[in-house]
UniProtKB/Swiss-Prot annotation:
Mg(2+) 2 binds at residues 21, 46. It comes from Thermococcus onnurineus (strain NA1). SUPFAM superfamilies: EF-Tu/eEF-1alpha/eIF2-gamma C-terminal domain, P-loop containing nucleoside triphosphate hydrolases, Translation proteins. InterPro entries: EFTu-like_2 (IPR004161), eIF2G (IPR050543), eIF2g_C (IPR015256), eIF2g_dom_2 (IPR044127), eIF2g_GTP-bd (IPR044128), P-loop_NTPase (IPR027417), Small_GTP-bd (IPR005225), T_Tr_GTP-bd_dom (IPR000795). This is Translation initiation factor 2 subunit gamma. One of its GO terms (molecular function) is metal ion binding. Residues 90-93 are annotated as: G3. NCBIfam families: eif2g_arch, PRK04000.1, small_GTP. GTP binds at residues 21-26, 145-148, 180-182. Residues 180-182 are annotated as: G5.
């Protein structure tokens, strides 16, 4: 008799990153069967996520030793064995969506950098690799995709080109796997590389829970009767600890309110009434994958992503909220993502910079300059730990461009 299939939550988040149209979404579909531009943008009941999430089980065939995401080996027909469940995060590759990609990068435990064989290394390839470097992500596999569009000599040429491109970066020793996502060619080799080079991070379930919020929603349909209304839903990824149905939670920095003509933020507490992970309702949720948290909050507070960038945890156990920051700054030599090579000029006093911290983004006005240090006044406060990494972007022309990173100091 067949055993009842036990549901497992994803245990690792793997980013699909790279230049627009290099095949990230097609590759995610080849690995998971889910087209993330529509399906995973819906966490059931119409919850939309701008960054696509899709879960898959990585399985290994005990007979031929090849990897797949199918219960039956597509290569020899034997039953496969479960290795682990992973969540693929499909990040936008368009230059205008770089800050969205950075929010997703903060949740990635590893990444597949997708480079199309017909185009090679492009501006957003560089930008996404630098984003991974800035958020401190070292577990990288490179997929040289669309090999069906070029001849063998071109594939070898691209391979050498990529080797040169990653020298001196976090991806210097990353394996480069030639694949065709469209035809499923070499996908088993890519999965084997993911298993070898992107380990599941160790999480202590007894640490205070912390979840970074990516989206938030009002799931009530227009015209719902008052007695049928359900509370606001928060979507994000747990980075430590665990959350349970019935837990009291605090959300920081919380909700904005006006006082003496100034906008201030107030933390809010509520109760978890439901949890979704991998599209299923669960009693407990752990780090890995996207988690939907149903709350008792007024849905007015959560509609249209109003809660994005917040941090969720147990009352009194969350990091501090900052409306001013002191950063130890590391500037890049060149601006990342532009067609032409531009030198990164020093940061100036009174300059406005865009800061990404976890899933939060805020503008910061530079109020003080020191040696390798800056002080900023923030437009929107952030909840973060001392020592947290901050991605720093500057407006270059009409776009925000990565120019460096910093660490929060006391």
């Amino acid at each position: 008799m067949a055993k009842k299939k036990e549901f497992r939550q994803a245990e690792v988040n793997i980013g699909m990153v790279g230049h627009v149209d290099h095949g990230k979404t097609t590759l995610t579909k080849a690995l998971t069967g889910i087209w993330t531009d529509t399906h995973s943008e819906e966490l059931r009941r119409g919850i939309t996520i701008k960054i696509g999430f899709a879960d898959a089980e990585i399985r290994k065939c005990p007979s031929c030793g090849r990897y797949s995401t199918s219960p039956i080996c597509p290569y020899c027909g034997h039953e496969t064995e479960f290795e682990r469940r992973v969540s693929f995060i499909d990040a936008p590759g368009h230059e205008a969506l770089m800050t969205t990609m950075l929010a997703g990068a903060s949740l990635m435990d590893g990444a597949v950098l997708v480079i199309a064989a017909n185009e090679g290394v492009m501006p957003q390839t560089r930008e996404h690799l630098m984003a991974l470097q800035i958020v401190g992500n070292k577990n990288i596999v490179i997929a040289l995709n669309k090999i069906e569009l070029v001849d063998r000599e071109k594939v070898i040429e691209r391979y050498q080109e990529i080797k040169e491109f990653v020298k001196g970066t976090v991806a210097e020793n990353a394996p480069i796997i030639p694949i065709s996502a469209l035809h499923g060619a070499n996908v088993d080799v890519l999965l084997a590389a993911i298993e070898e080079f992107i380990p599941t991070p160790e999480h202590d379930p007894n640490k205070p829970p912390k979840m970074l919020v990516l989206r938030s929603f009002d799931v009530n349909k227009p015209g719902t009767k008052p007695e049928k209304l359900v509370g606001g839903v928060i979507g994000g990824s747990i980075v430590q600890g665990k959350l349970k149905v019935g837990d009291e939670i605090e959300i920081r920095p919380g909700v904005p309110y006006e006082e003496h003509g100034r906008i201030k933020y107030e933390p809010i507490t509520t109760e978890i009434v439901s949890l979704q992970a991998g599209g299923r309702f669960v009693e407990e949720a752990y780090p890995g994958g996207l988690v939907g948290v149903g709350t008792k909050l007024d849905p007015y507070l959560t509609k249209g992503d109003l809660m994005a960038g917040n941090v969720v945890g147990k009352p009194g156990q969350l990091p501090p909220v900052w409306d001013e920051l002191r950063l130890e700054v590391h500037l890049l030599e060149r601006v990342v993502g532009t067609e032409e090579e531009l030198k990164v000029e020093p940061i100036k006093r009174r300059e406005v910079l865009l800061l990404n911290v976890g899933t939060a983004r805020t503008m910061g006005l530079v109020t003080g300059l020191g040696k390798d240090e800056i002080e900023l006044k923030l437009q929107i406060p952030i909840c973060a730990e001392v020592g947290d990494r901050v991605a720093i972007s500057r407006q270059v022309g009409s776009r925000w461009r990565l120019i460096g990173y910093g660490f929060i100091r006391e």
